[in-house]
Amino acid sequence: ADPFLADLPGRFLFAVTDATGAVLTEPVDAAYQALTPTSGVIRLAGLGMPCARDDAVAHLLERARLFLTHREGPRVWNIRDLPADSPVFAGLEPMPVDPAPPLTPGPVGGDLVAGIPLAMLRATHLSALVAITDDVVITPWRSLVVPSGAEFAADLEEAGFTVTESDPWARLSACTGAPWCARTSSPTMDLALESAARLGPDGPRLHVVGCERACGAPTLDHVLVVDPHSVDDILSADGALAR
């Protein structure tokens, strides 16, 4: 362990992905994308360089150390916020990426992508999972992949998972909000829970946040609902009150 790396901001993200680059839709800071069983590329802020698989972890950690050394103060949280001439980017070249889109709720062959409302696993969720599987894959998109889970979609939906794209929770998310975040008085998650019961299947993706920082915002197109204090504030942003 390297104690120096303990100073990395909580929003600093590493990623490891395969040739599809699926997780690179997210705002990761430092990533390794495997292109063959033994080699791939290091990616930072639209730049990259070839890297052997066995060297990837050491290289990612070294870039993280450079970030801590050269950022201009503790309020610089992410590599993408650094100037283009930062030593963090030494040796990297422009390297476009065309990642696969995020997984959405529903069956994928015999497997099932099960969305987790507000990314909060509850006892009912876990009880349903242990009844059908010993293994799940956690995604970066507030969901799980349940191997061979497609045939159990109805059971998982009853337990509170989102298993279709028509479920309101497939297009609704929220930051932590009050009372857990001192930056806002808006109870974002409570309001999102109340709103979900009144949202229809159609409409824009909504992300409810307590302030302009917009923590947890999805990378896909969405409507940002900032500092709401009633369910109507969210439904107005959705257009539901006008329909």
What is the role of each PLM region?
Residues 107-108:
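A short mid-domain helix/strand-loop element embedded in enzyme catalytic domains
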Residues 35-103, 127, 235, 242-243:
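An acidic, glycine-/histidine-flanked metal-binding catalytic module
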